[in-house]
Amino acid sequence: MKLLMLCREPNLYSCRRLKMTAENAGHKMDILDPNRFLLKIQENRPHFALYYQPNQGTPYLLPDYDAVIPRFGTQSTKMGCSVLTHLAAKNIPCLNNPASFALARDKWLSLQALAAANIAVPVTVFAGQDFQAGSAVEKVSSPTILKTLNGSQGIGVILADRSQSAVSIMETLTLSHIPVLLQDFIGEAGASDIRCFVIGDKVVAAMQRSGQKGEFRANCHRGGITQQITLSDDEKLIAVRAAQALGLDVAGVDLIQSKKGLLVLEVNASPGLEMIEKTSGIDVATQMIAYLEKKIAGL
Ligand SMILES: Nc1ncnc2c1ncn2[C@@H]1O[C@H](COP(=O)(O)OP(=O)(O)O)[C@@H](O)[C@H]1O
Ligand SMILES: [Mg+2]
């Protein structure tokens, strides 16, 4: 098969692993930067054309691919999802599909979708820019978490110890036209959460993450320490339901243990492979490529 990965940094562990694994399975894989595409909608068939601007040389018409794996970061969500939509319109299987990918990249819309599917999430509010910050902050508990809608790797997640701090941070962000959601802080989790790697209807690997000393964010990119973990059936079920609620084939589901029970913090559409493979000892890349092969075959 001829596979395409959409990614700006081909040297990242996840990209290298996926490319190597695909090639070992006898496939060819090109890695292209979504920001180097030109997308065209035209009258004549094929209605959807794509051109690519290589590093050196002139742009060329994109050849056909059998499937595409989106692995672009949050800085490229808009163009990346546009490229993905164009490829999906040409009936090229996408791991994940463009609508689900875009939904997962918006923290508020995805929490709404999770709640609509009866999946427990932390109490969260999203206020319009003209809603009084003080009244918005009163709707959640203190200390309060504030999150920008499309942050990642822990960036854009803020802990305000006092209500007054939450109000001033919210006012500052709103004035800067940065939409933000407010959320109950789950302090009882002790800066730990669980990352579940879901492929299809299975959790293929999981790990516990704990924030380093003095840090409430458990993200590996923020220095979080990882540990092997065996999930209960209940935890597995919630993770798979969360991925399915957003329509994702591949997802990194973050779970947090609160005093009210297990909650879904967020669902990532392009979860990293490095720490989950190294911590769990499971070859996640091979399972992703095997799943993609089945998807291409229409199984
Ligand atoms: N409501 C919360 N209560 C306690 N900790 C939280 C909460 N929300 C996020 N965190 C911590 O911050 C980390 C990053 O938050 P998350 O919503 O997953 O955003 P990101 O996309 O940046 O990973 C989580 O892994 C968790 O450790
Ligand atoms: Mg996260």
UniProtKB/Swiss-Prot annotation:
Give the record's keywords alphabetically.
ATP-binding, Ligase, Magnesium, Manganese, Metal-binding, Nucleotide-binding, Protein biosynthesis
Give its E.C. classification number.
Answer: 6.3.2.-
A single BP term in Gene Ontology? translation
Q: Which cofactor does it need?
A: Mg(2+); Mn(2+)
- Entry's HAMAP family? RimK
Which gene produces this protein? Answer: rimK
Residues that, per the record, bind Mg(2+) 1: 254, 266
Tell me which Pfam families the record gives. Answer: RimK, Rimk_N
Respond yes or no to whether keyword Magnesium is given for this record: yes
Residues binding ATP, per UniProt = 147, 184-185, 193, 217-219
PROSITE patterns found in the cross-reference section: ATP_GRASP
Cofactor binding description: Binds 2 magnesium or manganese ions per subunit.
Query: Where along the chain is Mn(2+) 1 bound?
Result: 254, 266
Q: Which organism is it from?
A: Mannheimia succiniciproducens (strain KCTC 0769BP / MBEL55E)
Where is the ATP-grasp domain positioned along the sequence?
111-293
Q: InterPro entries from the entry? A: ATP-grasp, ATP-grasp_RimK-type, ATP_grasp_subdomain_1, RimK, Rimk_N, Rp_bS6_RimK/Lys_biosynth_LsyX
Q: What class of enzyme is it?
A: ligase
Q: Where, in this chain's numbering, is Mn(2+) 2 bound?
A: 266, 268
Q: Which residues bind Mg(2+) 2?
A: 266, 268
Please state what the protein is called: Probable alpha-L-glutamate ligase
| Gene Ontology molecular function, alphabetical | ATP binding; metal ion binding; ribosomal S6-glutamic acid ligase activity
